[in-house]
């Protein structure tokens, strides 16, 4: 993301220099999370090697050590660390900076959230048959290439997907291991978050298979699949670690709902017309998958009958790159992209309004304002 950024809402244009905001002062927590991630991966590596010490891998033959290598490679290159940052600011919102209690738990939560996110990305790429992630080959694409290079038997794609499933499972297992040492209240909230995440992914898959294009379903997928698990649930976990009460949690949930919606709607735009140089994904990825997004639900309402027919072919039959590009252009011409941009702007305003509550620590309010801007106007 370029800094500073200029953003426009319905009635005001402001410039936000993220470098001047305290959200860039969560350094201690983020560094501790990264250190714990490294420690966790080192401990996993030690246990893996101890269990497989009797087997010496040959460089010219496929070997189960590739699962461990893929886990380490993927988890050791974290992205924006949004979820650990949200947990940090939830902790600050509940007075964590003043009493200092629960910070160790926030660090464990941050590392667990990042491992869970890695799990979700690896499995999501399998489900979406996506060969790229963060501008690099996805886990199953790497496994497929290795299968072919070393002359493995059977279907390379099926092998690669199976390896990616194992990689994701191991990442999830390590996340749960970290959470297992946390207080019961946090473990219950963690369980709720993971159930909600799986439910959202299931709605995404079923909605695509059913050709769902209604707004109600699209908003529900956005809320449960990405919005809640990116913003509200990490905020909740961090606040609980600092001993937050129900009234503050209600305020943070209000912020989380709107900020999470802004995040999910930006995902909608990036998944269709995002710059591949920033997103690491091909143009029109969500179109080709026929995903039940808010953007495509609005396109159903705005497009002509002929264009709607073309849109519905996506995910059902082969299409050319030129057809995808034409539909992306139509999303702009019809005003759908602009409409989603306005929805994002309104979501940001609503999120910022929630932070005016006197229950929220002033420092957390400033940090969360900066983060919602980062979520809403990011380029990847």
Question: What is each stretch, according to the model?
Answer:
Residues 1-113, 118, 122, 127-150, ...:
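Conserved N-terminal diphosphate/IPP-binding helix and adjacent helical/loop segment
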Residues 86, 175, 200, 296, ...:
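Residue-level signal for inorganic ion chemistry
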Residues 93-103, 176-189, 208-220, 236-252, ...:
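Inter-helical turn/loop segments and adjacent helix faces that build the functional surface
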Residues 106-134, 193-198, 228, 232, ...:
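Active-site alpha-helical segments that house and flank conserved acidic catalytic motifs
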Residues 133-168, 211-228, 250, 276-302, ...:
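Divalent-cation-assisted or electrostatically stabilized phosphate/pyrophosphate-binding catalytic cores
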Residues 170-179, 230-241, 256, 348, ...:
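Histidine- and acidic-residue-rich, metal-dependent catalytic cores
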Residues 306-314:
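Gly/Pro-rich interdomain helix-loop hinge
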Residues 325-380:
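Short hairpin/turn module used for nucleic-acid contact or packing/dimerization
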């Amino acid at each position: 993301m370029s800094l500073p950024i200029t953003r426009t809402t319905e009635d005001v244009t402001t410039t936000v220099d993220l470098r001047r905001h305290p959200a860039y002062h969560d350094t201690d927590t983020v560094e501790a999370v990264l250190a714990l991630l490294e420690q966790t991966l080192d401990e996993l590596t030690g246990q893996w090697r101890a269990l497989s010490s009797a087997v010496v891998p040959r460089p010219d033959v496929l070997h189960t050590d590739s699962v461990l290598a893929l886990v380490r490679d993927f988890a050791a290159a974290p992205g924006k660390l949004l979820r650990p940052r949200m947990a940090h600011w939830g902790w600050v919102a509940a007075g964590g900076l003043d009493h200092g209690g629960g910070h160790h738990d926030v660090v464990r939560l941050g590392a667990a959230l990042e491992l869970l996110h890695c799990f979700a990305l690896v499995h999501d790429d399998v489900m979406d048959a996506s060969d790229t992630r963060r501008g690099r080959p996805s886990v199953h694409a790497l496994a497929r290439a290795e299968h072919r290079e070393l002359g493995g038997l059977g279907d390379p794609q099926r092998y690669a997907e199976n390896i990616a499933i194992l990689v994701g499972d191991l990442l999830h297992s390590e996340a749960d291991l970290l959470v297992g040492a946390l207080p019961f209240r946090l473990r219950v909230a963690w369980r709720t978050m993971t159930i909600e995440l799986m439910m959202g992914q299931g709605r995404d898959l079923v909605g695509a298979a059913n050709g769902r294009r209604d707004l109600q379903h699209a908003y529900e997928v956005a809320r449960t699949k990405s919005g809640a698990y990116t913003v509200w649930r990490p905020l909740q976990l961090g606040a609980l670690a600092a001993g937050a009460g129900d009234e503050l949690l209600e305020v943070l949930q209000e912020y989380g709902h709107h900020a999470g919606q802004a995040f999910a709607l930006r995902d909608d735009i990036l998944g269709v017309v995002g710059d591949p140089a920033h997103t690491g994904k091909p143009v029109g990825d969500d179109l080709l998958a026929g995903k039940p997004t808010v953007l495509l639900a609005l396109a159903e309402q705005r497009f002509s009958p002929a264009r709607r027919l073309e849109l519905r072919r996506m995910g059902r039959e082969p299409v050319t790159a030129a057809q995808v590009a034409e539909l992306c252009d139509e999303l702009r011409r019809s005003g759908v992209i602009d409409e989603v941009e306005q929805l994002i702007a309104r979501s940001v305003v609503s999120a910022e309004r929630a932070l005016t509550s006197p229950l929220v620590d002033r420092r957390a309010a400033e940090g969360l304002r900066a983060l919602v801007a980062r979520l809403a106007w990011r380029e990847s």
